[in-house]
A protein has these predicted regions:
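Amphipathic alpha-helical segments used for helix-helix packing
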Residues: 51-55, 87-114
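Hydrophobic alpha-helical connector segments
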Residues: 63-93
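A short His-aromatic
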Residues: 41-44
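Basic, helix-initiating cap at the start of DNA-binding domains
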Residues: 1-32, 38, 49
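C-terminal peripheral helix-coil segments that are non-catalytic and often amphipathic
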Residues: 78, 122, 126-133, 138, ...
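Short, basic, alpha-helical segments at the C-terminal edge of helix-turn-helix-like DNA-binding modules
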Residues: 55-61
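Amphipathic alpha-helical packing segments from all-alpha helical-bundle domains
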Residues: 70, 74, 94-97, 107-133
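All-alpha amphipathic helical-bundle segments outside canonical DNA-binding/catalytic cores
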Residues: 111-116, 132-148, 166-167
Length: 189
């Protein structure tokens, strides 16, 4: 049973890379994995569950939450750096754009995409919320802050060939915090 699950997950992952989300059908997975339809449905009752399992198998797990010690700048740079390292993994370049594109057309895939994005935003969101709670940052729109911090990483990964590195992450955080500094009740660094 474990081997058939692994074969299915390997098949889904390879289909995601080669053909995108649209290429992940139960028939395609059965053909690629050699696993029976009943076995596929026993473990993944919906296509959505199959795609999500394939993404989890293909891509690294979300960045773990950082320790609460260190400056706000260090904590934000750390979580952005972890996300940037994940985004440099090759399957990311193939699977994520396909996932986001399919999410626009398929409601069940939109749920998968939303969960995937939320999982990756969570560590950054937690650092921002803690900083607002302890006065290190002024009250802010967390969604806008997430876009300001994560947007440059996504832009660079999807639209340029420039690397995602610690220096970039530190630069993004520095500019974000500089923009927040006029409203801060405690020192940012």
């Amino acid at each position: 049973m474990v081997r058939s699950r692994a074969r299915v997950l390997d098949a889904v992952a390879s289909l995601l890379v080669e053909k995108g989300v649209r290429g992940v059908t139960v028939d395609a997975v059965m053909a690629r994995s050699g696993v029976a339809r009943a076995t596929v449905y026993r473990h993944w009752p919906t296509r959505q569950a199959l795609v999500l399992a394939g993404l989890r198998h293909l891509l690294p797990p979300p960045v773990p939450r950082t320790a609460a010690d260190g400056t706000l700048s260090q904590r934000l740079t750390s979580v952005l750096g972890g996300l940037a390292r994940q985004m440099e993994v090759e399957p990311w370049a193939h699977a994520i754009p396909a996932l986001l594109d399919a999410a626009r057309r398929e409601p069940e895939i939109a749920t998968v995409a939303a969960r995937f994005v939320a999982d990756r935003q969570a560590p950054v969101r937690a650092v921002l919320q803690e900083a607002v709670a302890d006065g290190s940052l002024p009250r802010l729109d967390v969604e806008t802050a997430l876009a300001q911090l994560l947007g440059p990483l996504v832009y660079r990964r999807l639209l340029t060939s420039e690397p995602l590195d610690e220096e970039l992450c530190a630069h993004i955080v520095e500019h974000f915090l500089r923009g927040q500094s006029s409203q801060v009740t405690r020192p940012l660094r």
